[in-house]
C-alpha cells in the first residue's frame, strides 16, 4: 500500500471574517498515517514516511477491526496526569518514536481526524463533512483510540481549548477535499503565552546554531538566539510559547521582546 502524502494546515494570524468553518483542537504530538492492508496487517508511518509501527507497542492492534484497505490520518499523543488534570506529554511521544523507548508505549494514544481510503476506495476527493461521517463509522474507538472532537468554529471555543491545555485549534472548510501539501482550507491558530525571564547566557549549540539560556523563576529555559543577545545578558526579556508540557518545559519557546522597561514588568 503506497504511503499517501498528508494534507497540512496553513498557520493563520487573523480569525476568518466570514465563511463556514468547523474547528478541532490542535493536539501536540506526531502526525501518523495508519493503514490496514488487504491482509489485515496494520502499519503506521510519520508524515515523512518513517515506519513507526514497531515502536508503539500494542497501540495499533485494535485498528485491525477496521475495513481492510483503509488509511486513517491521526495524531500520536501521550497523556499524563498532573494535579488531577490530564495533560499532553510531548516529551514522551519523542521518547517512543525517536528513541524507541518501549517502556513509555502504554502512555501513547491515537487521535483520528480523517480517513483517506476506506475499504480500498480513495475517499480524499469527498468533502470533509462526508469524510468525517465515514471516519465516525469506520474508526474502532477504544481505551487509547479516540476520534477528534469537532464543533462549529468560534473565538470563544478556541479560547476554551487553549484554557484546557491545547496549543490552539485547527479550522476546516466543511466542503474541502483532502489534498496533499499545505492548504488554506485547513487553518491552524496557535496560542501564544508570554512570560518575563532573565537572559543568563548565549552559547553556540552542537548543531551550529546559537541558543539563549534564560532563567524563568528559577527554571532554566533554552531558546533559539543570536550573537547580538550577548550584550543583553543579565537583562529581562519576554518569552513567547504555545503551551507548557507535562515535564514543565515550554513548547515552541522563543524570545519575543528585549529591552523591557520597569513599566513592562509591573
Segments (PLM) and residue ranges:
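Catalytic cores of nucleic-acid ligases and guanylyltransferases
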Residues: 1-266
